């Protein structure tokens, strides 16, 4: 275990503790390193000899096709909870996990092939991800965590991992206010808007300016499972 803080007491003799200000310099001594969200690496991840993973990365690798990943600067806990309850009330086997305060691996035994996993993802969880969920949702982008990222561009780049490693048959649902530049999203983009100045509908069937009716305002479902 590498940590900048010094452990007050070592209760497990089988654990090697590496502490102090240079604790990150030991990473290349290992084949695989699990990184906690929010830790800033000293150099780009591709420059390390070891493979740097996280619990989120491994979980998404294992259950990618079943995951609805939701991120955004504001409102992601509310929307994640809403989506979970919509799925549950419709009779689906749904699981709520992630940055909302529910560690994903604590509920792994509950997952079946039919489980829909609603996963709240923070920028710190997404920052070094090399895999994206089957369905990714980006609600909004505002200036935040710039003490960690330094620039808005780096913060946005972390959020974009919600879709950047998707496949062509995956789905990316995004607010019109934070659509990525044309050509960088490999999956099918479905736009949604909460603005009221337009009454037009999207080709996807989702309606502009209707808030919750973006999902419930049409005769057909916006996304089928």
Give the label of every model feature segment.
Residues 24-30, 37-188:
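Phosphate-binding loop of NTP-binding sites
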Residues 2, 20, 55, 173-175, ...:
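Generic beta-sheet signal
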Residues 11-13, 47-53, 198-200:
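ANL superfamily adenylate-forming
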Residues 2, 32-34:
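A noncatalytic interaction/capping subdomain that flanks phosphate/NTP-handling catalytic cores
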Residues 9-14, 106-110:
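Active-site-proximal loop->helix
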Residues 1-10:
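NAD(P)-binding Rossmann-fold cofactor-contacting core
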Residues 12-26:
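Glycine-rich, highly charged phosphate/nucleotide-binding loops
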């Amino acid at each position: 275990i590498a940590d900048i803080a010094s452990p007050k007491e070592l209760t497990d003799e089988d654990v090697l503790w590496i502490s102090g200000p240079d604790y990150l310099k030991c990473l290349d001594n290992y084949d695989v390193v699990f990184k906690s969200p929010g830790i800033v690496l000293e150099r780009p991840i591709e420059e390390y000899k070891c493979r740097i993973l996280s619990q989120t990365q491994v979980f998404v690798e294992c259950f990618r096709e079943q995951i609805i990943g939701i991120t955004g600067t504001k409102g992601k806990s509310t929307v994640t909870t809403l989506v979970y309850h919509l799925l549950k009330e419709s009779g689906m086997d749904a699981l709520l996990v992630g940055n909302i305060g529910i560690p994903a691996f604590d509920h792994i035994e509950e997952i079946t092939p039919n489980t829909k996993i609603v996963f709240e993802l923070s920028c710190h969880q997404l920052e070094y991800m090399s895999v994206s969920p089957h369905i990714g949702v980006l609600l909004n982008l505002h200036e935040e965590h710039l003490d960690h990222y330094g620039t808005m561009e780096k913060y946005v780049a972390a959020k974009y991992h919600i879709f950047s490693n998707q496949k062509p048959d995956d789905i990316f649902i995004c607010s019109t206010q934070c659509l990525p530049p044309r050509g960088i999203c490999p999956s099918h983009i479905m736009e949604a808007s909460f603005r009221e100045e337009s009454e037009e509908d999207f080709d996807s069937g989702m309606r502009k300016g209707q808030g919750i009716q973006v999902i419930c305002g049409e005769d057909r479902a916006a996304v089928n499972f």
